[in-house]
């Protein structure tokens, strides 16, 4: 997309602004229905981006801490319904219904805590997916502007927000109906189904219980609880640079 604008700045000067979007925005124009069975989120990312004509390593990159945590129906060694052996994992269905490629991939990434950004090197806008701070690379230093025509920061603002600080995940797996979640301190049962809890360091009132996030094991529920807590932390304390 290209947004153009012309503004009269006075004193015989005009300001012409052009806003460019990366190639990833073109995926808004591809709207389909699709079903994935037993595929992990990283595998779906690679499949969709390759179908859009993007090449891994050149046009996009996955900087994930451990792709194994996104494996489909990753078991946690728990037996189901008194069984002597762990329950066999059931393939997960991931459905794209009347969604553009970009909306579909963005939704999947947001659910499991994968963010994406763009690097502009070697004349290419590379799309980078990451789930860890080191995936963003070393931060660049910019000085406050000391005069006209110099590159730097003009305005620095910091904003605090009150957010919930305790996050629960609750789900039910009919293949392992005996699973339950207990408080690690008191030992009392919190949910008689799959569950998990994550907290922020900040001590603020408020809690969120998310039901049916499609977690099939306690390990998966714990990962999602941590993701929801990290999302809230990202909104709690923000810096704005201009």
Regions found by a protein language model. Give the residues of each.
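Amphipathic alpha-helical and helix-coil boundary elements used as assembly
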Residues: 1-242
